[in-house]
Amino acid sequence: MAEALASQLNNTTLGEASSDTRWKDQLKAPAKDARPQTEDVTATKGLEFEDFYIKRELMMGIFEAGFEKPSPIQEETIPVALTGRDILARAKNGTGKTAAFVIPTLERINPKSTKTQALILVPTRELALQTSHVCKTLGKHLGINVMVTTGGTGLMDDIIRLNDAVHILVGTPGRVLDLASKGVADLSECPTFVMDEADKLLSPEFTPVIEQLLSFHPKDRQVMLFSATFPLIVKSFKDKHMRNPYEINLMDELTLRGITQYYAFVEEKQKVHCLNTLFSKLQINQSIIFCNSTNRVELLAKKITELGYSCFYSHARMLQQHRNRVFHDFRNGVCRNLVCSDLLTRGIDIQAVNVVINFDFPKNAETYLHRIGRSGRFGHLGLAINLINWDDRFNLYKIEQELGTEIQPIPQNIDKKLYVYESPETIPRPIANASQAQLATSGNQTQNMGERRHNNHSNGGHYQFGRGRGSYRGGRSQGQRRNMQNEMNKFGTSQNQQQSGKSQPAQVSPN
C-alpha cells in the first residue's frame, strides 16, 4: 500500500515537473532584444525571476513583456519588498526601478478582495499612465484591476470607476487626495504605499499632500521610496514615516554608462542652424529635444517642422488629452522628434530614443541627470548633446563637478558605434501597423534635409509643414496666442530661410 502511494506521488511530481518545463514554451514572448547592454543592468548576482518564488501567473506576464533576468535594482528590491519591509532605494534612471516595485506589489495583491491594496504615487500624468501600463502588462494573468487617476481629467469619471473593485491605484498626489478626502477612494485597508521619483514628490509643493495621504492608510503599511536622487528632505520623511527601512544604493556613479555626452558652444541665434546640422549628420532613431520654457518649446517645434523634419511637441500648458495623444503616438513611432519642457524628464521610458539634445542647457544637475536619462534606457547606448552659450558655461562646469562626469566638446564626426545599432530590427518598437514601422526603419535611419513628413496630429502638439511654413494646429490649453516675434528673432532665422526650409549649417566644434 505504502509503495503504491509512493509510486503515485512520484508520478504526480514528475507530471508537475514536466508541466513546469512546458509552460514557458507556450508564452507569446516578444523577439529578444539583441542590443548590447552596459553594467548598469548586467552586473547582477545571477538570480532568475523563478528564484523569487512568485506566482506563475505573474511570471507569465513578466516573460511575455520581454523580461529575461532581473536587473541589479530588481535583485536587491524584490526579495525584501515581498517580506513587507519598508524600502528606500536609489538607482539610476532606466535600470528597471518601475518593475522593481511593481512586481512585489502585484505578488501581494489578493484578487478576491474588492479593496484597494496598493497606492503608487508619481509626480506627472505621463509617468502615471506609463506606470499603470506596466502594472497591467505584468499583471495581465492575475485577474486584478489597475486604475490610473490624475489631475486634468474628469473627476466624475474617476468616481464612477471607483465603484468597481480597484486593486492598484496609480496617480498623482493631488487627485488621489481629492478622491480619498471625499471618501471615494478607500485606503483604510491599503497596505502598500509606493512613491516613484520620491525626491520630486517630497518637494515642498507635494509634502503636505503626501502626509495627508499617509493618514488614510493603516498604521502597519509598507512604504517604498524610489528615486535617482535623494535630497535631505527624503531623510526627514524617512525618519518620520518609515520603520527601519532597508536602504539600497546602486549609485556608485550618477550618469548611465551607455550615454556619451557632448557640448557645443553656440550663439543663441545660431542654435537652430546647429540643430539643423546635427539632424543632417546624426543617425537618429528617435530624439527628445529639451527647452527651458513652454514658449520656446512651441517655437522650436515650428522651426524644426519648417526645416522639413517630423516633429511633435509637449508641455504642461497643453490640454491633458492632447499631451496623452502626443506621448502615445511618439512612443509608438509615429514621429521621429519630440520637443518638450521638463515635463518628460522623469521616468518616461521610450527605448527607441537614442539621442537627447538640450537645446536649452538646464540650470541644475538634477534636471540634467533626468533629461539625459531619456536615452540609454536599460543599459543601452545613447547620445546627449548640449547646446551651450556664454551664459551657460558656469552651469556646465558646476554640473560636471556635482555629477562627477565629463561632458566633452563635440567632434566633427561622432562615432556611430556610440549610439547606433547595426540593425534596426534590434530596437524594440511598440508599433501597431506597418506604415509606422516603415517610418521607423526606412533607409539607413538617418534624417535627410529633403525629408518632409506631414504628421496630421488631430489633438495638438503638432506643426504641419505646408507652403514653406509651419502652420499652427492647436495644442494650447488656454488664453490668447502670445506674441512670439521677439523669441523668433532670437532664433535668428530669416523669412527666406523659413520659406525655403533650409539654413546654413553652424560650426558645432568649439572655437
UniProtKB/Swiss-Prot annotation:
Residues 7-18, 436-449, 483-511 have a biased composition (Polar residues). Its main location: cytoplasm. Residues 258-418 form the Helicase C-terminal domain. A motif (DEAD box) lies at residues 196-199. Its EC number is 3.6.4.13. Residues 78-248 form the Helicase ATP-binding domain. It catalyses: ATP + H2O = ADP + phosphate + H(+). Pfam families: DEAD, Helicase_C. GO terms for cellular component: P-body. It is found in: Cytoplasm, P-body. CDD domains: DEADc_DDX6, SF2_C_DEAD. Signal peptide: none annotated. InterPro entries: DEAD/DEAH_box_helicase_dom, Helicase_ATP-bd, Helicase_C-like, P-loop_NTPase, RNA-helicase_DEAD-box_CS, RNA_helicase_DEAD_Q_motif. Keywords: ATP-binding, Cytoplasm, Helicase, Hydrolase, mRNA processing, mRNA transport, Nucleotide-binding, RNA-binding, Translation regulation, Transport. One of its GO terms (molecular function) is RNA helicase activity. ATP-dependent RNA helicase involved in mRNA turnover, and more specifically in mRNA decapping by activating the decapping enzyme DCP1. Is involved in G1/S DNA-damage checkpoint recovery, probably through the regulation of the translational status of a subset of mRNAs. May also have a role in translation and mRNA nuclear export. Belongs to the DEAD box helicase family. DDX6/DHH1 subfamily. This is ATP-dependent RNA helicase dhh1. It comes from Aspergillus oryzae (strain ATCC 42149 / RIB 40) (Yellow koji mold).
